[in-house]
UniProtKB/Swiss-Prot annotation:
Organism: Shigella flexneri serotype 5b (strain 8401)
Cross-referenced CDD domains: MFS_MefA_like
The protein, known as: Lysophospholipid transporter LplT
GO molecular function list: lysophospholipid:sodium symporter activity
UniProt topology in membrane: Multi-pass membrane protein
Residue ranges of the TM segments: 18-38, 53-73, 91-111, 145-165, 167-187, 226-246, 256-276, 280-300, 304-324, 343-363, 366-386
Keyword Transmembrane helix listed: yes
Location relative to the cell: Cell inner membrane
Amino acid sequence: MSESVHTNTSLWSKGMKAVIVAQFLSAFGDNALLFATLALLKAQFYPEWSQPILQMVFVGAYILLAPFVGQVADSFAKGRVMMFANGLKLLGAASICFGINPFLGYTLVGVGAAAYSPAKYGILGELTTGSKLVKANGLMEASAIAAILLGSVAGGVLADWHVLVALAACALAYGGAVVANIYIPKLAARPGQSWNLINMTRSFLNACTSLWCNGETRFSLVGASLFWGAGVTLRFLLVLWVPVALGITDNATPTYLNAMVAIGIVVGAGAAAKLVTLETVSRCMPAGILIGVVVLIFSLQHELLPAYALLMLIGVLGGFFVVPLNALLQERGKKSVGAGNAIAVQNLGENSAMLLMLGIYSLAVMVGIPVVPIGIGFGALFALAITALWIWQRRH
């Protein structure tokens, strides 16, 4: 294991390979665990509106810890922070396996994920620089989405076989991620910062203000937040849409449909890495608008094959849209507030959007609005929101 403090800027350095492997296993566990736990809720006869609540407690951990996790990522070697965070995920998954309340166990996984995210993205700026940063983001997103593809399917398929087996597979994936983290080089950190919680909160709010007052980073924050809020809501919408629109009631089919989105995002992320630079980020905006349009069209489908094709298209558009926004925020944020703090602020925005959208979706399901009209309204509103963001960006 290398302990070098020097950065090897090669896109395929030993450290970068370890980051990608750890990211894949951790994201695999996250996505398999979601569908395995949803199957557990279904088996234990929880109400349908409680399904998005599961994700809400997960993202709630992100929001509550947002003022602190960025400084943690910047104050310690990011590879070690990632290892600790994956250990928390392992503990959360294991607790669900052993019969602890699934909402409590999933909250613990959320705490681990909150600590993990600033470190996993912040380390990219330490392992590579300049023009390779967008490509590194493309690799990171491709790894994550490949994990979403395989993890989602594995979670659903294994849960149809036996829920406990699915949960155990998630714990095993997190354990593998912990091992992979050991091989990430121990790069220089920024120790010596205050650990007073009030001061940390104030510092985080200052970072929020700094990024929000910069037009480029504000644009990136809003765009990425809208995308990920919509993405997680679509995932839960599919769980209810499949039996209504397609008449299929198993756990696996929604995961197959989610996998189509994942495949598309891998393609879109690769295209963005080749076609978009930090100077041409606005090229991604038409793709964002089209996401909403295609979601609207998708909601009206009643056949499986068109549903697969449209969801893959949504993924392609999504990958092309979000990868340049992530790279822009990391590059500008690293120079102003530190990479870890920049990603922590991004997480706050994204997870606040998720919490809001999931809350609205859960409320809509609770009051009895049919899932197809929910999907139509969701797609239309997303397209309008991205259009408004693009108009604002061009004017400023």
